Amino acid sequence: MFGIAQPGLVSLLAAAFALAPLSAPPALAADPAKVLRIEFYVAETGFDPVKVQDYYSQTVCEAIFEPLMTYDYLARPAKLAPRAAEAMPVISDQARTYVFKIRKGIYFAPDPVFKSKPRELTAEDYAYTIKRFRDPANKSPYESFLGGVLGLDEVKKDAERTGKFDYDRKVEGLQVLDRYTLQVKLKETDYNFAHILALPNTGAVAREVIEAYADDTNAHPVGTGPYMLTEWKRSNKIVLEANPSFRGLTWHFEPSADPGDKERIAAMEGKTMPQIGRVEISIIEEQQAAWLAFQNNELDILYLREQFAPVALPSNQVNADLARRGVTLSRTTDPDINYTYINTTDPEFGGFARDKIALRRAIFLSFDNAEYIRVIRKGQAIDEAYPIPPGVIGNDPTYRSIVPYDPQLANKLLDYFGYSRGEDGYRRWPNGTPLVWRYSSTPSSRDRELDELWQKSLERIGIRLRVDKNRFPEELKQERACQLLSRTASWIADYPDGDDFMQLFYGPNSGENNSACFQLAEWDRMYLKTKTMPDSPERSRLYRQLWRMVEVNGVLKMHDTRYRNMLLQPQVIGYKKHPILLAEFIYFDIDNSRRR
């Protein structure tokens, strides 16, 4: 999830991670009596970090697996820091070579595969993990993030030819210099690569574990992180418990400009982490059920969804009843974008003929973002026209969309390009058959409201709507196969740089993160040029051109960036929502004496 400007390389190299490891593995600090109860809004898809893409599965992976890098818990804006690495990487050759030194004495969680013997983490584990992204059998949605490693293209091509990826083959771009040192060489300059290795997806796995559970690696996560998966009822409940092999981390961070940091430091300074012994995650797809569970003290933290914001947060502050009960609010702006795309490879709506582009743009022109924020978001969002959100390097607050709400213009476009209305008032294809737009959404009450809003929008321009209902994991599966025509989707920053958002439209990422399966050679050439550039006015200019090309071709309609309102029960100590980190429970505590 993140980004790095060239002038900051030296300072990053000098940075030290505030969560320093203890000199020897301590007695487990986590207290089994400290149980954190949280919820996921949609179902997880699994826990093989190379294979998952969604926010919820990645949250669990972040608690179980350890990437080489991470982020400082308190620093804002997000600040890169070592995790399994001893220090920041040594970067050379114009950011084409990265060398990581791995901490000694890190061990994987117990598993029968290890035959009761301690299994230490080594540089070879990270080399193996990186190779897994390029194995065609894994179909990793994050393959492109590791696509720049020198020599892996050839290994992948041979795997496609033979049907088997050769993990033992020497690769120029992945050199294990010694047991604890990994050198990565890239084909091109990449100032963001250290941020890529902070992704939860890049957490180290043990080869013997993957091979032992090859039939279902999503169900058998074994990592070196602070937690282990001890129970999983798919789409229902996930239970994590503290990893007894975890080395322990000492809580120490410098305060940011946030006034609340002083209180957090007073409560947490010097504690051995993690403190929480058990994390129970319930899948609660309906907003009302989650809200009631929090009110009944069945949840310790609630990501308050839009439906109940007017009740819980009058004037964006907790209501009097919640305040009396000691409930507090953590409110931030998410580094995310929310948008509706149209699949440009669809046989009916796809392609780049002028009439198809006009049709897609007309559909987007019919949709009123202001109404969407008022009705669906209940005011808990900011209208956003640019695909790089506030707080992320490359955001352009001055950008104005060429597909604003304008149903009059939409109707003129449709009339001009021959999408005429029949006697029933609905439009037809130029060949006379009914024109029906297909849209996918989940069965949740919020999505039903969104269906109605799209129905209302399309009625303005005389287009019929067919809504296909799918659970979220099935939507993702179909989307990655370029089988969905359209969906309202979200992308939250993997790392705080605009590249993480621009890669959503890169042609070769179709089948991964390019939901619209948008492929345009001119766009791809310009994007690849930006990949080798640090943050600069020139890169920002190219980003603006790239986004304009996406809008001109009727690929996507930007909607908003959300406020994230987290309600905290009084027993939650030291919590701070991070813009990039997902499993914040690694860094905060529970005080059972404060439970109601």
Model-identified regions with their sequence ranges:
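Non-catalytic accessory/assembly modules
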Residues: 140-163, 167-197, 201
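Bacterial N-terminal signal peptides
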Residues: 8-23
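Residue-level recognition of beta-strand termini and adjacent short loop/turns
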Residues: 92-94, 178, 234
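Cleaved targeting-peptide boundary
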Residues: 29-35
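N-terminal secretory signal peptides that target proteins for export/translocation
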Residues: 1-7
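N-terminal lobe/hinge region of extracytoplasmic solute-binding protein
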Residues: 39-93, 222
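Extracytoplasmic/periplasmic ligand-capture domains
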Residues: 30, 73-74, 97-99, 103-139, ...
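Sec/Tat signal peptide C-region and signal peptidase I cleavage site
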Residues: 23-29
